[in-house]
């Protein structure tokens, strides 16, 4: 059984730090420190949500477009998908790898869309970065502050020619890629790679049908 959307959405309901201001020049993006990028992005997305009445009201199409255009470009989906699929990734054909990336991305887009629709008055505390000069992979550790206990939210990031990109996310001690790897392995063992693709496609189709439903007045 794949990760329950409701449970994961509950975990990442404050995972808004992934947002990106796409007007940022490429040169600045490539020079920006990873912890500063997370801090800036968190402020950007909070400002966007507070200013956009459609997002606040739960307009699913608007939220999905927001996530797809502003968040996902800062995620290394090739690495994330390959890691989630595990050893079976190398056995997959190029076409299967392409489909896996597409369906996995769609799944995460809708998951984050559900998370962003729940953002209210949270703030983020970015902890001091523990890294050496020249490091190309780091973990940026943060806390989400709101009602109740602080929520641990950490990012695994890698330095690329286009700046720092996220390839894994830790919420309350649970790494996203590791969680999906376990579930994907079970699906592949039972139904093969094509079976995993079909399962992801079905979940995304069902999610799209739900999103297309009538809006409440």
Region annotations inferred by a language model:
Residues 171-217:
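Low-complexity, intrinsically disordered terminal/linker segments enriched in charged
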């Amino acid at each position: 059984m794949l990760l329950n959307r409701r449970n994961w959405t509950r975990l990442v309901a404050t995972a808004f730090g992934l947002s990106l201001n796409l007007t940022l020049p490429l040169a600045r993006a490539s020079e920006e420190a990873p912890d500063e990028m997370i801090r800036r992005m968190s402020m950007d997305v909070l400002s966007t949500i507070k200013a956009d009445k459609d997002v606040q009201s739960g307009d699913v199409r608007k939220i999905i477009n927001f996530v797809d255009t502003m968040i996902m470009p800062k995620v290394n989906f090739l690495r994330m998908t390959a890691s989630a699929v595990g050893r079976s990734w190398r056995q997959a054909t190029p076409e299967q790898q392409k489909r896996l990336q597409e369906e996995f991305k769609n799944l995460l887009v809708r998951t984050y869309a559900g998370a962003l629709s729940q953002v209210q008055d949270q703030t983020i505390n970015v902890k001091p970065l523990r890294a050496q000069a020249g490091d190309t992979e780091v973990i940026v550790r943060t806390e989400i502050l709101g009602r109740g206990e602080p929520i641990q939210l950490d990012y695994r990031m890698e330095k690329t020619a286009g700046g720092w990109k996220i390839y894994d996310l830790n919420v309350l001690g649970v790494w996203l890629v590791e969680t999906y790897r376990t579930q994907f392995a079970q699906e592949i063992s039972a139904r093969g790679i094509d079976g995993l693709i079909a399962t992801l496609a079905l979940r995304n189709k069902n999610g799209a049908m739900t999103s297309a439903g009538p809006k409440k007045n």
